[in-house]
Amino acid sequence: MPENSSNEAASLANIEKSFGGGPDSMVHVLKGSTLTACMGEMLLLIGPSGCGKTTLLSILCGTLKPDAGQATLFGRKLQEMKDSEITKYRGQNIGFVFQQFNLIPTLTLAENVAVPLLINGFSTRNAERMACEALARVGLGDRTRTKPGKLSGGQQQRVAIARALVHSPRLIVCDEPTSALDKETGAQIMDFLREIANDDQRAVIIVTHDPRIYKYADRIAEMEDGRILQETTGKTAIAEKYLSVPH
């Protein structure tokens, strides 16, 4: 955990989570995991498949409740909130970027980016204006009327990032944002995400198996068997520990 938590975006303290139908079939996925994400930093969550990364992130975002421990998002304890409150709070404060772009092929880029705004009650006019501004932010301001099928993979991921940013969330959560991209395009996406974290002073959390992007992190949290094994902070320490990983 970072020494300075005054700029804390989200925290998980001693989180436990099991799945199964009874004592004999219980699978203990999280075993006392603790993690903190801060504003202005890019945090990478790494570890082998099945170690609990997705479950941990689901609890941090309020889409899953822990069996024990405390989840806090921007100062609010999620366990003390009603499901409807969590849904609204998550929608206001978190933007999501996934491995699959999930763009609607029949809609223009602006219409795709505007979808979450329209769902949350924004007028069509305001949603379109905000969508165009978000697309300009990711370098696609001249493609607002283009359909997704005419874009490269990297450009489609930029649209997905614009959609995540359109409502100005304080936390961006990314699940394998570069795995479907080539090295050069992935580097461009990571440069942009780091800019969002460091320059815009947002919190960015990335779940990844891609060692090529470790160098972009301000901090790396390594998970194994339902626990956070260790955290590495600082570019030098990250480079020494992780950048020698074969890839």
What are these regions (language model features)?
Residues 2-4:
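Pre-NBD coupling/linker segments of ABC/ABC-like ATPases
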Residues 9-216, 220-223:
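ABC family nucleotide-binding domain
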Residues 219, 227-247:
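Conserved beta-strand-loop-alpha-helix hinge in the C-terminal portion
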